Every structure is written in C-alpha cells, then in structure tokens.
C-alpha cells in the first residue's frame, strides 16, 4: 500500500525483527505503549490485539513476514527512500536506519546507536543527519547458541546476571567469558573511536539485551558504561518521524 497522505491519529508501528514482532501504539505523536509478540505464520484473526482495525506502519528485516503482513487491509511498508537520512546505502537495514533517525530526533545529533538484538549493530550519523556508517556482528545470545549448535560437546549457556570470571575454571563460565568479554572490548573500542570523531555525541543502547549489556559495560568499563543511554523505543520514534511527514 502506498503511503497515505493524511495525518494519522491512532496508528500502530510494527517492526518485524529477526526473532520477534515489535509493536507500538501511537495516539498522534504520542507513543502510548509497546509490546512484543512471536512471528506469525498466518494473517492475525480477531483474537490478535490490533485495536479498531488501525493502520499499521511496518518496517521489516524478514521478507517472509513482510509478505504476510502486506495482505493486511491497511498497512504501509516503510522503506529506506522515505527516511530523511542522507548517505544511506541500498542494503542498510531499515531497523538500523530507523533507530539512528529516532535517536537523532530524541537525543540529538551526532549519535551512535548500538542495537543489542539477535545481531549486535553499530550505526552512527553526524550532525547533518548523514549516515557515517557502522558494523554488524552476532549478538550475545546468537554467539552462545552457535557454539552449542555447531560443536559436539559444548552446552547451551544462558547469559549470567553478573559478569563471569574472565579466566574461568569450568566450561559454562569459559563460554560466557569468551563471548561477553570480547563483545565488551569491541563495544568499548567502537565507542572510543566514535568519540574521537564526535566527542560530544550521545551513545544510545537499544534492543532486547540492552539492560544486561549495559550492566556488563558499567561493571567492566564504568567510564564508558556510565555515559551510555538506554532507549527501547528509538526505532518507533524513527517511524513517528516518517509517519508525521505523510
């Protein structure tokens, strides 16, 4: 469906992520609530919580789910070319683009967004709302799960509430140490490199693992972690910027 050139009062934002559906309920420009659901295999029925058949503004990184939701009666798919963000490249993930757009709207530019989801991504924009670039690597849980799935003897391990010993003396903690400490070192390096170019920039942490990752950062590198801001809704705030322009 083509973008509707009318102002929306009540509308739903839907971000289709790699692991889940992320929803937001807007009344005008106000984000009333946000929630997550599992991916669906069919169009939702009357039991699914879409209030009053509202318009859905959708962004997606999962093509199969995009195709499913395009059959909904009132849906608009948000694409890169609709974003007021300069310097984007064709394969940039719409989630990353919306996140850095939303972070800039709320927290100011320049800004670096770290999204701790299935993938761990870094995305930065300068003061002119131009994409500087970023990086992608497997997220914390994906790294842990990959070791369990692709090796014969290593167990599936969960993220600990607190940092494991760096030099572990058992296999579960050794896996936690290897994954977590190398990710933290990488995050520190990226943030420090960003601050060299943009010393006044905010660092925004979002995504499903944002809280536990921030706690690790604040423990291991408090001089970094204590300056990181968490915001779970910046993708939806980026959507709001796009929808407001319709």
Give, region by region, the residue ranges found by the protein language model.
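Gly/Thr-rich phosphate-binding beta-strand-loop-beta motif of the actin/hexokinase/Hsp70
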Residues: 1-29, 103, 110-131, 147, ...
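N-terminal glycine/serine-rich phosphate-binding loop of ATP-dependent small-molecule kinases
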Residues: 1-85
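Short, aromatic/basic amphipathic alpha-helical patches
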Residues: 66-73, 214-224
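Phosphate-binding/catalytic loop of phosphoryl-transfer enzymes
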Residues: 76, 81-150, 181-190, 226
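Glycine-rich phosphate-binding loop signature in dinucleotide/nucleotide-binding domains
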Residues: 106-108, 194-199
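Active-site rim beta-loop-alpha module in soluble metabolic enzymes
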Residues: 137-197
